[in-house]
Amino acid sequence: MGEAAVAEGPCPLLEDSFTRFSSQSNVYGLAGGADGRGELLAATLKGKVLGFRYQDLRQKIRPVAKELQFNYIPVDAEIVSIDTFNKSPPKRGLVVGITFIKDSGDKGSPFLNIYCDYEPGSEYNLDSIAESCLNLELQFTPFQLCHAEVQVGDQLETVFLLSGNDPAIHLYKENEGLHQFEEQPVENLFPELTNLTSSVLWLDVHNLPGSSQRLSALGCQSGYVRVAHVDQKNQEILQTWTIQQDGPISRVIVFSLSASEATQDSPQQEGYSLLVASMLEPAVVYWDLLNKGLDDQLLLPGSDQFDSVLCGLVTDVDLDGQLEVLVATYGQELLCYKYRGLPEDSRGFRLLWRRSFASPLLAMAHVDLTGDGLRELAVISLKGVHILQHSLIQASELVLTRLRHQVEQRKHQQGLGDRVGPRPVEHPAS
């Protein structure tokens, strides 16, 4: 066990609501909702899927949880994982994937259901989508179901990626002509996701903005971690880094702390790092992958003090424009870390705050559920979904402070322009 870390301050988020589950969920049980709207889908082990959102009731914004009736999920089924994505333009529509194991007596039967409605006007209607199902029987036990956008010919395509105990990653791509999804060899589009010797517990595919390249990271049950730098145009693996850690890997996340935006002419090549959460070790960040590989390891102090780290998230949770690293544990603690780069000899992550819950934490999402421009932090625990919000008083003060700063900046710029004044008009010589 590492040394105990002391938080710099209290958690700035307040719990706005809690919705109890009828049965527990798991680390793969949370997904986003339709068409970028503020909605979450949470799956429970006993075959139930809840749609969670806020809506205007009697002139007040209130949380609403509704059970969605997805077809072809037997009452005795145990849901393993759920994922959603919006089709890549110019295609339209929301796609929902659910894996489950049906109780078939001595041996459970695993399935993948893919839901998608092709009727114009219903492409984003969850109730309609839930009735339009493709049912695929699996020959392996499923784990994480996720999605990735990939270049196919001259257009972008979003596909499902499903890890299994075979051990392999399976790819499911839409056949537009048949209006259904089909399994295709993963090596055709993701050559870096082959030759696995242990089940992948978490996969993260991160397309690098402004380029045709991506970083793919996977963490396995054996503790094996692999990161690959890939050029999508010619399916070339440019570089691969691997490391062996102790214990199963619960989460890998590729992220960039760089504030600069990449463009097509100036792709961002630096600043990509990797969060790795292990069930037996402290969570770590491997800093600056493209330049240092997995050589520069930064510890998240105290992350091993509260049992296993089960999930992580990299997002700007304190509204300062810089990303923080959140990790949530089986020991019922949510920990928030901030990178401090100076002084150079003590650079690393500091524990900003921690927050305790009443049951183990499984999954997280940072989404704008209320539609007010401020994102809420949704935390899935064994017992239900907690929605954490910023204090509206503090948020409004922050907005006013930044508006005043903008006004002062503009006044200063106008003042400089007035002092310089217009250039004198030159009269031609007579």
UniProtKB/Swiss-Prot annotation:
Chief localisation class: membrane
GO molecular function: actin filament binding
InterPro entries with a match to the protein in the record: Integrin_alpha_N, Kptn
Disordered: annotated segments: 410-430
Gene Ontology cellular-component terms listed: actin cytoskeleton; KICSTOR complex; lamellipodium; lysosomal membrane; stereocilium
Basic and acidic residues bias: start-end ranges: 420-430
One GO-annotated biological process of the protein: cellular response to amino acid starvation
Key words, A-Z: Actin-binding, Cell projection, Lysosome, Membrane
Residue intervals passing through the bilayer: none
Subcellular location: Lysosome membrane; Cell projection, Lamellipodium; Cell projection, Stereocilium
Disulfide bonds: none
Biological role stated in the UniProt entry: As part of the KICSTOR complex functions in the amino acid-sensing branch of the TORC1 signaling pathway. Recruits, in an amino acid-independent manner, the GATOR1 complex to the lysosomal membranes and allows its interaction with GATOR2 and the RAG GTPases. Functions upstream of the RAG GTPases and is required to negatively regulate mTORC1 signaling in absence of amino acids. In absence of the KICSTOR complex mTORC1 is constitutively localized to the lysosome and activated. The KICSTOR complex is also probably involved in the regulation of mTORC1 by glucose.
Complex formation: Part of the KICSTOR complex composed of KPTN, ITFG2, KICS2 and SZT2. SZT2 probably serves as a link between the other three proteins in the KICSTOR complex and mediates the direct interaction with the GATOR1 complex. May associate with F-actin filaments.
Protein's name according to its UniProt entry: KICSTOR complex protein kaptin
Lineage: Eukaryota, Metazoa, Chordata, Craniata, Vertebrata
